[in-house]
């Protein structure tokens, strides 16, 4: 994998030689039953005369290379790059090669549907994987027009960035085939081109955009999955997104059509291929799901649509400005949801519970980096699709918008799009427009917020007189060691008092916080509230420390706060407090168990359940862990039983109970639910919930391999195969663990999604069963990182890292990190992040007294 790297210096040098890439004409022959496919490309480009460079091409074989009419030796190809000597000022390059299909979700992924045996293909090119499908100058600033011609079996359809211009059918050696001819694209980067092929089914619609142009819409999925696709919801969200973005940006949608395709075994949430967006199939709901997942799908739809402007129309010059794509799409998707969809009431509460939690965690790891990151090579960028680039960037943009004003912000974006359409940009291209429209010193703001790392802490310092009125209120700002930056913050202080059993806001102060201490003069003389909530409305990006009185109020009445955003801020503040070892973990467990029953925001409920799970696993003192886990599972069962029938809370609380099951009595309840002897009013044991029960029963030694096989026979679908892999790997025997260790760590035979589920199963259950694999992990992981693809190795490095946080594990990890060679920086980062988690867990355990 490291041998496939491309450095920024190499890209800069190549861009100085390649003056302009005009066009690619790409002919693909895609058989359904082979491991390789034919790829023939003609590239027209201008270059520095007499210079030499290379083109990226990860090939099975290269049949021929022709540069300006001269046949070159195929020895110039090494399977990863093809050398191009003695370039002319104007060049035509023709390469005929064979490329590999993959089962890793990178390049051109091939999937066989177990339900009907049909073959499906889709491409995933970001960051550096269009080179797995056709020879290409794989860097974002060498834009070109792309014309695709694709031959496939006659019953397949092909979807790409542009509409097809014609489809020809004829007999060939392997039966009848169709050749699809697509219009050339506008100038774009190679990573947002796309090919999706197979017997996909589709639903169509259209919209009329702000120019009066009719935009065709399509939603695609596998035949066996199409009955579960909610195309109308996708179309509704898409129309709402189009309306909002075109109005805000004053820039029309830049492409001719907008197709959205659910594709199998997809690694990410979605990919913003221009006019041809791909989504993971988790967003097709064949069973009842938490409302949090429906809202996440909506945010993802809006996120990918925002990319049509941020990233596709205007693209970063190099990957250090990836945030110009991802932070903007992340922020704009929540803004669009809040201002133009049915999720208006909950969108920012969801942002607080999800994105902010992710950002704060990532920003406190040793791998944290500025939003505008230093990206030396592709290995750097592949690990920077993280909580900084996405969630912190979006959080900071929200702060910027509050600071410069939304109208000024959007006006700057219009000029930015007008100036740089179909081109590439750097940070300063945006800052100059923001300064012009707002009159603010945005560069100074950027230096503190975008170009430095770390999260500040804002703490309330409050005093009151004998009458209970505030006599002094200050906000003290601090920073973590090694990140000595104090930043300006726009924030709101909310005054909350108990009114008829609800914590209701009775006053607010909006202010700028800057420097070490900000005195809030406006608060002096006001009645001290039951809860003084710093960062009410969640505008600021900072860890929040409440005063003691407010903490006690929150612990007793968190579920009684009537604002979901305010609850989210309090939940987040208390979670940070326990993570920083300033609240005992068991006290936090009680806080969660006493309040989640009243939480109405689905994502907040999901986040608190996840935080509860992390606390039980890693933060509770070892001597109290089992008892606390048993008590927590019992309480989750009680909450599930009294939750409103058929509600979101009932489903989430029941799933949480299933995952925390430990005692024989708890397993009895799981088994009785599975067998139908026990029911909860309104609860349907549908396909996915049934598999949840199967996996947990397997973990507890109550479900055999033969029983799992029988379940799979009844649900031999992509979902069923994934769950079955998890269940098999969950069986608590040495033989089952050894079998899946071998499949994951040795043979590498599993596809990306099957491997993900298998890792989850392998790690479940009693830690002593897999403790013997701790040392083999360290012995094998560098070899896996060097030999497997990026996505596969990322899953294994993080997923198979020993799970029990102990002092011995911390010591072993430190020794391993010290032994890594310099060229393993990306591997070092991933292991170091795991090490950080162990170190934090040990610190929090010590405070759990």
What function would you assign to each model-found segment?
Residues 387, 467-472, 483-485, 498-505, ...:
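Long, ordered, helix-rich scaffold segments
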Residues 42-59, 138, 147-153, 474-476, ...:
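Surface-exposed beta-strand/loop patches in extracellular or lumenal glycoproteins
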Residues 57-114, 135-138, 172-175, 516-527:
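A surface-exposed beta-strand-loop module
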Residues 182, 211-214, 218-482, 614-615, ...:
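Hydrophobic alpha-helical and helix-loop surface patches within well-folded domains
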Residues 1-38, 114-120, 140, 443-447:
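N-terminal, polar/Ser/Thr-rich
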Residues 61-67, 442-443, 453-534:
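Beta-strand-rich binding/interaction modules
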Residues 3, 98-206, 374, 541, ...:
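Extended, low-hydrophobicity, Ser/Thr/Pro/Gly-biased non-transmembrane segments
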Residues 22-50, 460-466, 475:
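Extracellular ectodomain segments of secreted/surface proteins
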């Amino acid at each position: 994998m490291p041998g496939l790297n491309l450095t920024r210096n190499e890209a800069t040098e190549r861009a100085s030689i390649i003056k302009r890439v005009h066009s690619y004409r790409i002919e693909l022959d895609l058989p359904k039953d082979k491991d390789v496919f034919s790829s023939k490309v003609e590239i027209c480009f201008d270059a520095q005369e007499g210079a030499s460079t290379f083109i990226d091409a990860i090939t099975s074989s290269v049949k021929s290379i022709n540069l300006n009419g001269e046949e070159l030796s195929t020895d110039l190809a090494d399977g990863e790059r093809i050398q191009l000597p003695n370039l002319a000022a104007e060049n035509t390059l023709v390469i005929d090669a064979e490329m590999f299909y993959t089962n890793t979700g990178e390049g051109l992924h091939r999937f066989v549907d177990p339900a009907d045996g049909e073959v499906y293909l889709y491409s995933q090119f970001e960051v550096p994987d269009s080179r797995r499908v056709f020879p290409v100058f794989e860097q974002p600033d060498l834009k070109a027009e792309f014309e695709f011609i694709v031959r496939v079996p006659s019953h397949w359809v092909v979807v790409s960035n542009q509409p097809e211009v014609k489809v020809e059918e004829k007999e060939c050696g392997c039966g009848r085939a169709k050749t699809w001819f697509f219009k050339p694209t506008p100038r774009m980067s190679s990573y947002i081109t796309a090919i999706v092929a197979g017997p996909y089914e589709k639903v169509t619609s259209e919209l009329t955009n702000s120019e009066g142009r009719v935009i065709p819409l399509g939603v695609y999925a596998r035949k066996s999955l199409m009955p579960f696709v909610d195309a109308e919801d996708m179309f509704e969200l898409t129309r709402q997104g189009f309306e909002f973005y075109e109005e805000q940006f004053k820039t029309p949608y830049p492409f001719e059509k907008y197709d959205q395709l659910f594709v199998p075994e997809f690694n990410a949430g979605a990919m913003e291929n221009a006019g041809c967006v791909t989504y993971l199939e988790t967003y097709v709901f064949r069973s009842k799901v938490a409302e949090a997942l429906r809202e996440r799908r909506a945010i993802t739809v809006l996120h990918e649509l925002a990319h049509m402007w941020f990233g596709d129309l205007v693209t970063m010059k190099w990957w250090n400005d990836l945030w110009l794509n991802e932070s903007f799409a992340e922020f704009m998707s929540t803004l669009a949801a809040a201002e133009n969809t049915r999720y208006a009431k909950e969108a920012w509460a969801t942002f607080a519970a999800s994105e902010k939690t992710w950002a704060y965690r990532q920003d406190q790891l040793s791998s944290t980096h500025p939003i505008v990151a230093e990206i030396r090579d592709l290995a750097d960028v592949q690990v920077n699709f993280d909580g900084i680039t996405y969630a912190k960037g979006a959080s900071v943009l929200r702060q910027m918008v509050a600071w410069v004003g939304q109208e000024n912000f959007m006006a700057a974006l219009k000029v930015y799009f007008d100036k740089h359409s179909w081109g590439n940009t750097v940070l300063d291209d945006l800052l100059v427009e923001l300064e012009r429209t707002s009159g603010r010193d945005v560069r100074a703001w950027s230096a503190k917020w975008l170009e430095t790392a770390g999260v500040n802490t804002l703490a309330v310092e409050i005093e009151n007189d004998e009458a209970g009125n505030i006599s002094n209120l200050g906000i003290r700002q601090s920073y973590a060691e090694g990140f000595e930056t104090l930043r300006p913050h726009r924030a709101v202080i909310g005054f909350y008092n108990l009114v008829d059993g609800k914590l209701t806001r009775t006053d607010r102060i909006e202010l700028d916080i800057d420097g070490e201490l900000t005195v809030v003069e406006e608060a002096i003389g006001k009645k001290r509230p039951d809860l003084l909530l710093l960062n009410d409305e969640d505008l600021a990006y900072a860890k929040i420390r409440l005063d003691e009185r407010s903490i006690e109020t929150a612990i007793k009445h968190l579920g009684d706060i009537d604002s979901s955003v305010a609850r989210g801020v309090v939940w987040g503040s208390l979670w940070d407090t326990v993570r920083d070892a300033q609240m005992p973990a068991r006290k936090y467990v009680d806080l969660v168990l006493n309040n989640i029953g009243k939480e109405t925001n689905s994502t907040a409920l999901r986040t608190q359940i996840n935080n509860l799970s992390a606390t039980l696993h890693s933060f509770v003192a070892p001597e109290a862990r089992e008892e606390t886990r048993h008590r927590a599972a019992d309480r989750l069962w009680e909450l599930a039983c009294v939750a409103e029938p058929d509600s979101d809370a009932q489903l989430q609380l029941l799933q949480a109970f299933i995952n925390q099951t430990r005692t024989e009595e708890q397993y009895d309840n799981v088994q009785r639910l599975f067998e139908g002897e026990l029911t909860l009013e309104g609860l349907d044991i549908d396909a996915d919930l049934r598999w949840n029960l199967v996996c947990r029963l397997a973990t507890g030694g109550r479900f055999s391999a033969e029983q799992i096989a029988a379940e799979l026979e009844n649900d031999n679908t992509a979902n069923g195969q994934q769950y079955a892999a998890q269940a098999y790997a969950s069986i608590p025997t040495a033989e089952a663990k050894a079998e899946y260790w071998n499949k994951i760590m040795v043979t590498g035979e599993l596809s990306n999604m099957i491997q993900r589920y298998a890792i989850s199963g392998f790690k479940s259950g009693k830690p002593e069963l897999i403790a013997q694999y701790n040392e083999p992990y360290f012995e094998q992981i560098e070899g896996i990182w060097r030999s497997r693809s990026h996505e596969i190795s990322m899953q294994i490095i993080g997923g198979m890292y020993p799970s029990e946080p102990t002092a011995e594990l911390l010591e072993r990890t430190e020794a391993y990190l010290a032994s890594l060679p310099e060229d393993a920086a990306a591997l070092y980062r991933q292991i170091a992040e795991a090490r950080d988690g162990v170190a934090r867990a040990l610190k929090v355990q010590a405070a759990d007294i």
